[in-house]
Amino acid sequence: MSFCASFIGTGNMGSALAAAVSRADQNIGLFDLDAKKAQTLAKSIGATVTTTEEAAKSRFLFLAVKPNVIIKVAKSLSGILADNTVIVTMAAGVKLEEICAAAGTNRCIRIMPNTPAAVGEGMILYCVASEVTKDDEADFLNLLKGAGVVDKIDEKLIDAAAALTGCGPAYVYMFAQALSDGAVSCGVPRDKAAIYAAQTILGSAKMLKNSDKHPEKLNI
């Protein structure tokens, strides 16, 4: 079977992106050493559990594995990739040139996504290797149109930017908890406080995004 996109690794980030790609109504393959994880995700998003050999023939092959094993995984793909396959790597701190050298191809895209991609509101940063064509890039952007905002950035800046986008959600959740805890301490039911906090953050973020003002100017 030929897949438009396949994912090696179905952890938090791999699952979030696979869910986003599934919204583009694409044929998706999933592989994980933990077969039950792959099967559970496949059932929930309408994907197919596959092998690494089949995944290597996909148009886009997402390597959603930890940084400490990604080079090993990339090396295992050398020589079995299809001519039009583009590798998409998301391992923090691992440069494009390292992935390209290990996999034996310069058709690689490096991305730094965040988990809100699972609900179509992610912030995905990306940069491309030398042999990624304009058509490849256009197909890649179309594939991730259901993930949120996708922005191209120089690789030398991607780690710094990803510190904001990748860690940011955790800070927002902590802030939301603090807001709701404060309301609960004043007698507001927990379920209502959680909704109020989430909507307040959502509305404020939308105002900030739609405004050309500095955040300080909105703090009135």
Task: Indicate where each model-derived feature is located.
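Short pre-catalytic strand/loop immediately N-terminal to key active-site residues, enriched for Gly-Thr
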Residues: A5, C108, I158-A163, L218
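Internal alpha-helical scaffold of NAD(P)-dependent oxidoreductase catalytic cores
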Residues: E98-R107, M123-A161, V172-S211
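Small-residue helix-packing motif on alpha-helices
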Residues: A38, I70, P189-A197, L218
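NAD(P)+-binding Rossmann beta1-loop-alpha1 motif at the extreme N-terminus of oxidoreductases
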Residues: M1-T50, F60, E121-G122, V184-C186
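Short acidic-hydrophobic, aromatic-tinged amphipathic segments that line or gate anion-handling sites
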Residues: T48-E53, D151
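Short, intrinsically disordered, charge-balanced linker/junction segments flanking boundaries
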Residues: K213-I220
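Rossmann-like NAD(P)(H) cofactor-binding subdomain of soluble oxidoreductases
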Residues: L17, E53-Y126, S130
